[in-house]
Amino acid sequence: MVKNQLENLVSEFPQLSIRKAASAVGVSPTFVYHIFHDDMHLKPYKFHLWHKLEDKDYEKRLNFAHWFLKLPESTHEHIICSDEAYFYLTLPVNNQNNRQWSKSQPYIGTENPLHDQKILVWCAISANRVFGPYYFEDSVNQHNYLEMLKKYFWTKVLRTAEYKKYYFQQDGARPHTALTVQTWLKDKFDDKFIDKDMWPPRSPDLNPCDFYLWGHLKSMVYNPLPKTLDDLKANIEREIKKISKNILELTFLNFKNRCELIISAEGGHIEMK
């Protein structure tokens, strides 16, 4: 009888906590846990914001993983991965604290506030340093993105004496794939430019900006809570300065591990424990 009640509850409210389920049916949390885990074979999954892969993506993810793992270890520290992300003035929901009871990993999305003040931040990351931040005042397009690459990244951030040893990655966002942008980057980085044909689409689980940098920054920049966008920028810059070289090296070791897992998953999504 109690088991049936719990089955109905978790079916209707899959995000129900053990404590609330126990209170609803009048039993102990320990009893509920054993029913969920041992009898119903459920697990408390974290929310993951995954991009649904298309059929052609699997091969591209495999190809990239094999390419990366064939590189000499000494070149890994010379790979620069880049990305943009919105930072909202209001503290976002922390999905790390959310769980859903399920027999398999669910696909769940959450939304950011619709009209909240926000800034668009560009950063790049290597095993040695974080490049940026650079702030786009409006949405990014091929023109202001190329201007950023030329006037900020190239002239002020990336020392020209060093650039020939670096690989440069960007994802397939429309401003990145514009012909003018692709041509300029190929001219600067030559065969070390990881272009739109080489980088697998819908693969934030491979980009260190996505699987480390943005999440880390967003967990730190709201303490203290910013009152203005300038406060938020100052917090972002403060936290970037705190990131140690050791953390960056571990992040790129994680990058390598993820490539190995993608091969094991035959190009599919990977679950990092």
What are these regions (language model features)?
Residues 1-273:
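Surface/interface recognition patches
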